[in-house]
Amino acid sequence: MDAAATKPHAGGGPSLVGEGSFACVFHPPPRCFTQEHPLSKRSDADKPLGIGKVFERNGDAIEEWAIIKAIAKLDPKQAYFIYPLSQCTVLESAVRTRPNARGCSLLGHSAPNPSREYIMLKMPTARETSVAYVDSHRKRLTIPELLRGMIPVARGLERLARAKIIHHDLKQDNVMWLSAQEGFRLIDFGLAIPMGNAFDPNKNWTLAANYFLHPPEYRMFHQWGRAPRSAALASMEYEEDRHLLAQIAVLPKRTLLDEITSRYLPADQQHAQWTAFHDALASKPTLADARAFAQRYATRIDTYAFGLLLVALAARLSQATAPEGFYRFVGRMISPDPRVRPSPAAVCKWIVASAAKAPRQAPPPPPSNPRRPRHAKQKRP
């Protein structure tokens, strides 16, 4: 880090405090806990300049704890998705944004700094993960109440879809419980990618990661990114490589998790829907056509992971009485055919409507015969 970046800006503005590339950008300068109080013992050896490094800090004005995380380098190749992401109020509403010199935005109390190579995210410290909260309240929590808490997550996914961004890491550890008023909150945008790069192996390395929360159609493209190409094929346009397109015929037709029960989506429907999409994708003459066909439904990639999350959490509840249409709608969310899945806007609308059916807990009634205080007693005449 250069010396100019480590001293306060002119006019007493924000300064960088910390060690090396793990510095925080805040005013007044916060304490960055790197070695003394590590928040998470995670390996950052494979991430340049500590991208993904997690810090714990104290609030600027009030005594509150917040999470600070570097998510991206501000270079022309990696910063193109940051601006629309910052416009989505998926994080807490208290986060303020200011545009920097490159036309992007920085999340947090930061000032323009064109030389900065990363940005910092400020997030509130959560009470529990979604699984921990459901496990601790499993005896009295109902599915409609669970859906009510998921409304902020559904709205966040809808905003991301409008901004043409895929969260790409919607798992149980990234949905945190804040409070009864705020519900669950979606966090961790370290794997977020532009929607247009979803099926491009050169821009989406997670196609080959084979994560369980990724939709089944990813399995049809991940081999193309890893298959070796000869010098003759390398000189051709990758999108027109018919040799790689032919590999689709040998991929399996059943890729859903075994944990998904038949009450959400019967096995025969799983096979029929997967076969229909498989045949539609394999019938495309070129890889470019197949990619364009799958790209039409990229907005529903997060829908699949969100459906898996609802399945996992609902299975942990003791009071598993679901509202009408719950299993049928979630079965559409986890369909192997993205054409069957609802859009994020439809998911948000359905969750809001289903949560409205949950009776809100009324405050406890006052005692029927309250005892009068001693000082209120009156003497007999």
Where are these predicted regions, by residue range?
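Conserved hydrophobic alpha-helix
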Residues: 153-160
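Conserved C-terminal C-lobe helix
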Residues: 322-335
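Catalytic-loop of the protein kinase fold
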Residues: 161-179
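Conserved structural core of kinase catalytic domains
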Residues: 79-145
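A conserved short helix/loop substructure at the end of the activation segment
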Residues: 332-347
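C-lobe/activation-segment region of protein kinase-like
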Residues: 183-185, 189-317
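ATP-binding glycine-rich loop module of kinase domains
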Residues: 21-103
